[in-house]
Amino acid sequence: MTTVTHGFTSDTLGWRAWLDTVSLDAATPDQLAVLEASHPQAKTSDYYLLLVHLPEILRQRSGVFNAIMYGPGGLSRAERELASTAVSRVNGCVYCASVHAQRFTQLAKRTDAIEQVFDDPATAGTTARERAIVRYAIALTERPDTVDASDIAALETEGLTHEEILDLSHAVAIFAWANRLMLTLGEPVFPEPADSA
């Protein structure tokens, strides 16, 4: 078990919907197909079982999300996960932060940047490039109307290409959406503490 910092953790969390979910027994063939295409664990996730009430929206959402987060080229997968964790931390989405912190750790083989994001996102990043990515993610999350050419120039200074900046912007934007769905339609479920007997 990892440490919980300001309510955030890299532990595996559950998520419980506050609205009714679709029972697999009652799901239409289209709903089942959308679940299968969305995520490997969609059929056991309250989040997907809630969103599949509107299968066409979930189909589109999953396609866009998967293309942004897993598509080839552009920003590295680890950097996308770092930005997503930073957005989730700023938005207060404990569940999304835990998932994407784990993915960053798996891809980057380290936890230092994630620990920094959980502790103080404004100063997080182990390199100038990571700090620029996190700062841009925070700015686009907290003050999108103030992001301008100087923010893009700061990313370029740290070596980000235009394709990488576009990928980063997409990752930040999709998490504005994902975090809001998670925060308004349910709640994270922390694992039960192990007996100390």
Named regions from a protein language model:
Residues M1-A197:
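Hydrophobic alpha-helical segments
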